[in-house]
Amino acid sequence: MATYLIGDVHGCYDELIALLHKVEFTPGKDTLWLTGDLVARGPGSLDVLRYVKSLGDSVRLVLGNHDLHLLAVFAGISRNKPKDRLTPLLEAPDADELLNWLRRQPLLQIDEEKKLVMAHAGITPQWDLQTAKECARDVEAVLSSDSYPFFLDAMYGDMPNNWSPELRGLGRLRFITNAFTRMRFCFPNGQLDMYSKESPEEAPAPLKPWFAIPGPVAEEYSIAFGHWASLEGKGTPEGIYALDTGCCWGGTLTCLRWEDKQYFVQPSNRHKDMGEGEAAAS
C-alpha cells in the first residue's frame, strides 16, 4: 500500500494517467492525494473529473480556486472563459452529477498517522490545526448545501485579508476560501497579500511566502500544497511539499510517493496540442 500525492492536474488527463501508470498506482490498494485545481486550462477536465470520481475511497482531494470557479460557472454566477476549456465538461450529460459531487469535496485533508496535512494553497501561519479544521468545515457546509450559489457569488474578493476569530458571515467565509485556495504571500504578521504571484525571489518587501513564516501547524505536521507553479517545487523548508509544477503551462505533473519521499514526473503534452509560440506565451 502506497500513498501518492500529485500536484495540480488542471485538466491534463493524459499526463495524469501516464503518471499513475508510471508509479503503478493500484486503486483499492494504494491511495491518491490530489492538491486541487483538477480542472481548467488543460483539454481533459471532463475526463479528469470522471476518473477521479470513479476512484471512490482510493482518492483524497481538496478543492482549489479553479474548482470553485468551475462551480461558480456551473451555477451561472461566473462567465465560462474559452481559455479554461471547460465547455465539454459543462455540456456533458453527467455534468450535474460530477459537479454536485465536486462541491461536496473538502478544503482540507489530514492524516494523523502520517502527520500529513494537505490544502490547495497551504495553511496560513495564523491558524493552528483545530482552527483550520473548523474553518474548512464552515465553507464545506455551505458548499454542500442548497445555498451554495449565494456563497459562490460572494466569495470573489481580496478582503478581509487578516484572520480574526471575530470574523463573521460572508467576510469570514471569503477569508477562509482565500487562505485555503489563493494564498501565496503573507506580511510578517501572517496577513494575506492577494496580489503578488511571482516567485519568492521577485516579491516586494516585506512579503514572504506563507511557509516562510513560522506557524503552529508546520511545527507538528508536514504540509502538501499545490497552486504555486512558479515555485517549480523548490525552495520550501523541510516538511513542506510544493507539488504544482505547471503541467498545464508546459511544465510537468509531479507525484510524491509518501512512504519513501521519491518523486516522479510526467512531462506536459501542452506543446503537442498547440503551437510552441502559444505555449511559450502563456
Swiss-Prot record:
InterPro entries associated with the record: ApaH, Calcineurin-like_PHP_ApaH, Metallo-depent_PP-like
Catalytic activity: P(1),P(4)-bis(5'-adenosyl) tetraphosphate + H2O = 2 ADP + 2 H(+)
Annotated Gene3D superfamilies: 3.60.21.10
Superkingdom of the source species: Bacteria
One Pfam family it belongs to: Metallophos
EC top class, as a word: hydrolase
E.C. designation(s): 3.6.1.41
Keyword flag Repeat: no
UniProt keyword terms in alphabetical order: Hydrolase
GO MF terms, alphabetically ordered: bis(5'-nucleosyl)-tetraphosphatase (symmetrical) activity
Role summary: Hydrolyzes diadenosine 5',5'''-P1,P4-tetraphosphate to yield ADP.
HAMAP family, A to Z: ApaH (MF_00199)
Stated family: Belongs to the Ap4A hydrolase family.
Protein name listed in UniProt: Bis(5'-nucleosyl)-tetraphosphatase, symmetrical
Lineage: Bacteria, Pseudomonadati, Pseudomonadota, Gammaproteobacteria, Enterobacterales
